[in-house]
């Protein structure tokens, strides 16, 4: 039996991209970012996520963070939903970023579990409730214990949905494909369940998920959009064909600390320079060779 907390259709579905943030000589490269936004939309991406982990949000100033969100919203012109990153391990800071995103016209905010300070489940609940109050737009909970240490328990998600109508979904980077059916039963079909792991995107769909917030789609937006479209149209062979084609690319995107690999790939495709901010550094020659092989396998170069 499906849960009754979220009965309507999920608001956010399909192939979504956790956008990189391009730099040139240490400065935001706004023109390249605009090009990336249009490249994504023109190749079928269903939603864009600026200033998340892949967008190097921890090393952006608040002014830069807000600028990237504003440019993404303006350049996309309502063609696809914008889910703005608003994560911080400070509830006050996350609330400020979320409030700005809402006022700027974002469709939702993506809020990561607070990292480093290891809050209890009660602390997580209070954090997300406070940020949702500040955002005044839908909030996607970003559960990534590999980076944040503390996981968001299913019971905490249920409690959030019971007590705040703007808690609208999850970006699940746990790679636990048993979770979508659990949350369908506990919360309902209207709670957007988005994989945060490229390699498990298709299994996540098969388990009842609704889409993926992807790193690889910075590089292969069309292949990933086609995979999701094929799945949604019951063309499972085509979906699996694209999934197999992309596996080595998914692996290559994390051969070193992200977003180093994806930025190198973006430079190879002429999207922007590979420059990242410290402590992310230029990737090793062996990693570059591995990425080039993966790009060739996907017929991207």
Name each region found by the language model.
Residues 2-17, 21-24, 28-149, 159:
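Active-site beta->alpha loop and helix N-cap motifs at the rims of alpha/beta catalytic domains
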Residues 3-5, 11-22, 39, 43-45, ...:
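C-terminal alpha-helical cap/extension of soluble enzyme domains
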Residues 26, 58, 87, 190-191, ...:
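A generic secondary-structure micro-motif detector
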Residues 33, 65, 69, 94, ...:
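A general structural signal for well-ordered alpha-helical segments in protein cores
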Residues 37, 69, 128, 164, ...:
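Short amphipathic alpha-helical/adjacent loop interface patches that line ligand
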Residues 60-63, 96, 121-124, 152-154, ...:
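Short secondary-structure transition/capping segments
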Residues 74-80, 104-105, 135-137, 162-166, ...:
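Short helix-capping segments at alpha-helix termini
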Residues 133, 147-254:
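Catalytic alpha/beta core domains of metabolic enzymes, predominantly
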């Amino acid at each position: 039996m499906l849960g009754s907390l979220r009965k309507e259709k999920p608001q956010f579905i399909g192939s979504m991209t956790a956008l990189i943030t391009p730099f040139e000589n240490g400065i935001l490269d706004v023109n390249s970012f605009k090009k990336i936004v249009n490249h994504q939309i023109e190749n079928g991406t269903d939603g864009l996520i600026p200033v998340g982990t892949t967008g190097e949000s921890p090393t952006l100033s608040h002014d830069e963070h807000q600028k990237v969100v504003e440019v993404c919203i303006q350049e996309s012109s309502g063609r696809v939903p914008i889910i703005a990153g608003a994560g911080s391990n400070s509830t006050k800071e996350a609330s400020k970023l979320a409030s700005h995103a809402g006022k700027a016209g974002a469709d939702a905010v993506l809020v990561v579990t607070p990292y480093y300070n290891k809050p209890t489940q009660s602390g997580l609940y209070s954090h997300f409730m406070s940020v949702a109050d500040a955002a005044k737009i839908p909030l996607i909970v970003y559960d990534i214990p590999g980076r944040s240490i503390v996981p968001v328990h299913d019971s905490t998600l249920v409690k959030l949905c019971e007590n705040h109508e703007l808690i609208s979904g999850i970006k699940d980077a746990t790679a636990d494909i048993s979770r979508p059916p659990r949350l369908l039963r506990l919360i309902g079909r209207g709670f957007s369940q988005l994989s945060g792991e490229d390699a498990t995107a298709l299994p996540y769909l098969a388990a009842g998920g609704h889409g993926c917030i992807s790193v690889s789609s910075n590089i292969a937006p069309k292949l990933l959009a086609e995979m999701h479209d094929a799945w949604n149209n019951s063309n499972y062979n085509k979906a699996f064909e694209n999934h197999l084609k992309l596996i080595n690319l998914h692996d290559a995107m994390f051969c070193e600390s992200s977003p180093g690999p994806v930025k190198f790939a973006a430079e190879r495709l002429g999207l922007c320079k590979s420059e990242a901010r410290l402590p992310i550094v230029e990737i090793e020659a062996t990693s570059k060779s591995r990425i080039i092989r993966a790009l060739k396998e996907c017929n991207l170069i």
